[in-house]
C-alpha cells in the first residue's frame, strides 16, 4: 500500500500547469463510440486511472484505442459489442456514459450497475428516463441495466428532475443519432457539457444550447471521427488555488480558465485571497489571515460539489465560524472524521458541516474516502504540525496527475512512498525537499 507523507509549514510558490479535465474527457471518450466512420483523435488527455478504465471499456466493446503522449486515438468503426461488464464499471461510474452511445449505434446496451466514489446513492434514473422518452425499453435486474429499442430512437422533449451532469451527457449523446429533434430541459450547464457538445458537433452532430438550461439536439444519420482538444480541469485548478491560499503562498496556475472558476474565485476573494487573472492563467496569493465564510454547493454556475472538501480544508484555517452545506450529493462528508483525527474543530449537522477556526492541525495517519477528499487531506497536511500520512491513494489517482510531484515543485515537503519503505526515518522525509 502506498502513502503520501507531507510535512506542514511551507509556503507554496511558483507555477503549476493543470491537465485536461477528467470530468470532460470521460464522457467524450464514451461518445467517440458514436462515430461509425473514421478515427477520433483527442488531445490534452490526462494520464489518470479513470482514463485507462474507460479505454478498457471501449476496447471490450470492440473499439480500437491507443493512448500515448496525452493523446487518445479511437476507431469505433467496427460492429460494437453491447455489454460493459462489472469488472470495469465497478471501478468507475462514468462507465455508464457508454450506454447512450451504444443505444444510439446498436439499438441495445447492457451495462453493469456503476461504481466509483462512494458518494451517496447517485442513481442513474434520470439517464433511463431520457432513454425511455426516446422510445427505449429499460430493464434493471441481476446487477445490470439494459436498454433496447425496436427500430431507432426518436427525438423527444425531456425534462430532467435535477440538472444531472451525467444524465445530460448521456441523453445528449444518444439523441445525436435519434430520428427527429430532442429538447432537453433543466439540463446541466457545466463547462464539461459544452466541451462534449463541441466534440459531438465536430463529429457532425447538431447540438445547440449547451451551457444553458435548454439543449436542442437535431438527430443526424451518421457521425464521423474528429479531432478535439479537452478543456482544462477546473477542479484541479481550484485545488491548487486552495494550496496557494492555505499556505499563504503565491502560485500561478497555468492553463486555468477564469470563466470556469467564477464561483470558486468569488468565495476565495470573500475569504481575503487575492486572485489575479493573467494571460497564462490565474495567479493566487494567500493572505496572512483568512476570513470565515459560508458555502452551499449547487449545480453550475453555483459552487461545485467537487471543491467542497478542499474548501473545507481551507476553512479550517479561517478565523471564525464557517459552514458548508452540501445540496448535490448525500453522504459526502466522510472526510470530516479524518479531519477530526487531525485535531480539527468540525461537526456535521444534517447536510451541513460547521467549522470553528483557525485550527492548529496535527499531523496524523488518515485515509482518503473519495477522490476529492484525498486532495483535501493532503492540503490540510500542508499546514499541519508534524507529518500527515494519507492512505487509499487509489482515489487520488483517479483525478490528479502527479499531485505530490506538482506540490513538491511548489516547495512542499512531500513524498509518495510504498509501505515496504514506510520505515523511512522522519528526518529523511523532511530532508527530501530541503
Curated annotation (Swiss-Prot):
SUPFAM superfamilies: EPT/RTPC-like. Belongs to the EPSP synthase family. MurA subfamily. It is found in: Cytoplasm. The lineage of its organism: Bacteria, Bacillati, Bacillota, Bacilli, Bacillales. Its main location: cytoplasm. Pfam families: EPSP_synthase. The gene is murA1. InterPro entries: Enolpyruvate_Tfrase_dom, Enolpyruvate_Tfrase_sf, MurA_subfamily, RNA3'P_cycl/enolpyr_Trfase_a/b, UDP_GlcNAc_COvinyl_MurA. This is UDP-N-acetylglucosamine 1-carboxyvinyltransferase 1. One of its GO terms (biological process) is cell division. The active site is at 117 (proton donor). UDP-N-acetyl-alpha-D-glucosamine binds at residues 93, 122-126, 306, 328. It catalyses: phosphoenolpyruvate + UDP-N-acetyl-alpha-D-glucosamine = UDP-N-acetyl-3-O-(1-carboxyvinyl)-alpha-D-glucosamine + phosphate. Keywords: Cell cycle, Cell division, Cell shape, Cell wall biogenesis/degradation, Cytoplasm, Peptidoglycan synthesis, Pyruvate, Transferase. Cell wall formation. Adds enolpyruvyl to UDP-N-acetylglucosamine.
Amino acid at each position: 500500500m502506498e502513502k503520501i507523507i507531507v510535512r506542514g509549514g511551507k509556503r507554496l510558490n511558483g507555477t503549476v500547469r493543470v491537465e485536461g479535465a477528467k470530468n470532460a474527457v470521460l464522457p467524450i471518450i464514451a461518445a467517440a463510440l458514436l462515430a461509425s466512420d473514421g478515427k477520433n483523435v483527442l488531445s490534452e488527455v490526462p494520464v489518470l486511472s479513470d482514463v485507462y478504465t474507460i479505454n478498457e471499456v471501449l476496447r471490450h466493446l470492440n473499439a480500437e484505442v491507443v493512448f500515448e503522449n496525452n493523446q487518445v486515438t479511437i476507431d469505433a468503426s467496427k460492429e460494437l459489442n453491447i455489454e460493459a461488464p462489472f469488472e470495469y464499471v465497478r471501478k468507475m461510474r462514468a462507465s455508464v456514459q457508454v450506454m447512450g452511445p451504444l443505444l444510439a449505434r446498436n439499438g441495445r446496451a447492457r451495462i453493469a450497475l456503476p461504481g466509483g466514489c462512494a458518494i451517496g446513492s447517485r442513481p442513474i434514473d434520470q439517464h433511463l428516463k431520457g432513454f425511455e422518452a426516446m422510445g427505449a425499453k429499460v430493464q434493471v435486474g441481476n446487477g445490470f441495466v439494459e436498454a433496447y429499442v425496436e427500430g431507432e430512437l426518436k427525438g423527444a422533449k425531456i425534462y430532467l428532475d435535477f440538472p444531472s451532469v451525467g444524465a445530460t451527457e448521456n441523453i445528449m449523446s444518444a439523441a445525436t443519432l435519434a430520428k427527429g429533434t430532442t429538447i432537453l430541459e433543466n439540463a446541466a450547464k457545466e463547462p464539461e457539457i459544452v466541451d462534449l457538445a463541441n466534440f459531438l458537433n465536430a463529429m457532425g452532430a447538431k447540438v445547440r444550447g449547451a451551457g444553458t438550461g435548454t439543449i436542442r439536439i437535431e438527430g443526424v444519420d451518421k457521425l464521423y471521427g474528429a479531432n478535439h482538444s479537452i478543456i482544462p480541469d477546473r477542479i484541479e485548478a481550484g485545488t491548487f488555488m486552495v494550496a496557494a491560499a492555505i499556505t499563504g503562498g503565491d502560485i500561478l496556475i497555468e492553463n486555468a480558465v477564469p470563466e470556469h472558476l467564477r464561483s470558486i474565485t468569488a468565495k476565495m476573494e470573500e475569504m481575503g485571497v487575492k486572485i489575479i487573472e493573467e494571460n497564462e492563467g490565474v495567479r493566487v496569493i494567500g493572505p496572512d489571515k483568512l476570513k470565515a465564510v459560508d458555502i452551499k454547493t449547487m449545480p453550475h454556475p453555483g459552487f461545485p460539489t467537487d471543491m467542497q472538501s478542499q474548501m473545507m480544508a481551507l476553512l479550517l484555517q479561517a478565523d471564525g465560524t464557517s459552514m458548508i452545506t452540501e445540496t448535490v450529493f448525500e453522504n459526502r462528508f466522510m472526510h470530516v472524521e479524518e479531519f477530526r483525527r487531525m485535531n480539527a474543530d468540525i461537526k456535521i449537522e444534517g447536510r451541513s458541516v460547521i467549522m470553528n477556526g483557525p485550527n492548529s492541525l496535527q499531523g496524523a495517519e488518515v485515509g482518503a474516502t473519495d477522490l476529492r477528499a484525498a486532495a483535501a487531506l493532503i492540503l490540510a497536511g500542508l499546514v499541519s504540525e508534524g507529518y500527515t500520512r494519507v492512505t487509499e491513494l487509489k482515489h487520488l489517482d483517479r483525478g490528479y496527475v502527479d499531485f505530490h510531484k506538482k506540490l513538491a515543485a511548489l516547495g512542499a515537503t512531500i513524498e509518495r512512498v510504498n509501505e515496504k519503505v514506510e520505515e523511512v526515518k522522519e528526518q529523511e522525509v523532511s530532508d527530501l525537499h530541503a
